[in-house]
């Protein structure tokens, strides 16, 4: 019988195993805060980004975003990324949206969304809005 050929396994040096990876992109959505009173209440989420990738202006950043800004960012990504399918955001919540468990579920959904989007190579290299949304306190969505 023919012997199946296996790819050659390269041994890593200790330096390679413990060296800083070539591309780091870590995104966390943390620290939700609810603001306002009554009908004017809303929740913001802190986006913490750590990277060494050249497509981002800052290696470490932290910005706050409302869900409505995530929606605008999502729409902008869909318009500029014709070849990439943009994953959906966690759904709109109309009742009891300020309960801790509801806010935590949304936080997790927003974090997963950002990690998927930011991890896509075409979006990383071609998006005009990704780094701005993740890093710029002055992010201004276009209509």
From Swiss-Prot:
MF (Gene Ontology): phosphatidylinositol-3-phosphate binding
Subcellular localization: Cytoplasm; Golgi apparatus membrane; Prevacuolar compartment membrane
Cross-referenced SMART domains: PX
Membrane disposition: Peripheral membrane protein
InterPro entries tied to this protein: PX_dom, PX_dom_sf, PX_Grd19_PX, Sorting_Nexin
Keywords of this entry: Cytoplasm, Golgi apparatus, Lipid-binding, Membrane, Protein transport, Transport
A biological-process GO annotation: late endosome to Golgi transport
Annotated binding of a 1,2-diacyl-sn-glycero-3-phospho-(1D-myo-inositol-3-phosphate), by residue: 66, 68, 92, 97, 106
GO cellular component: a single term: nucleus
Pfam families: PX (PF00787)
First-listed, main subcellular location of the protein, grouped into a coarse class: cytoplasm
Sequence ranges assigned to domain PX in this UniProt record: 23-140
UniProt xrefs under PROSITE patterns: PX
Top-level division of the source organism's lineage: Eukaryota
Role description: Required for retention of late Golgi membrane proteins. Component of the retrieval machinery that functions by direct interaction with the cytosolic tails of certain TGN membrane proteins during the sorting/budding process at the prevacuolar compartment. Binds phosphatidylinositol 3-phosphate (PtdIns(P3)).
Family: Belongs to the sorting nexin family.
UniProt free text on domains: The PX domain binds phosphatidylinositol 3-phosphate which is necessary for peripheral membrane localization.
Protein name as it appears in the record: Sorting nexin-3
Source species: Schizosaccharomyces pombe (strain 972 / ATCC 24843)
């Amino acid at each position: 019988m023919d012997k199946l050929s296996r790819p050659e396994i390269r041994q890593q040096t200790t330096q390679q195993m413990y060296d800083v990876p070539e591309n780091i992109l870590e995104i966390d959505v943390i620290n939700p805060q609810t603001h306002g009173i009554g009908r004017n209440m809303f929740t913001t989420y802190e986006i913490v980004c750590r990277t060494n990738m050249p497509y981002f202006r800052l290696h470490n950043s932290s910005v706050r975003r409302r869900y409505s800004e995530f929606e605008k960012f999502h729409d902008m990504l869909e318009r500029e990324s014709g070849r990439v399918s943009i994953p959906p955001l966690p759904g709109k919540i109309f009742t009891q949206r300020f309960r801790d468990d509801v806010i935590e579920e949304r936080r997790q959904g927003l974090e997963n969304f950002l990690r998927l989007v930011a991890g896509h190579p075409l979006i990383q290299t071609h998006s005009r809005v990704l780094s701005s949304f993740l890093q710029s306190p002055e992010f201004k969505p276009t209509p």
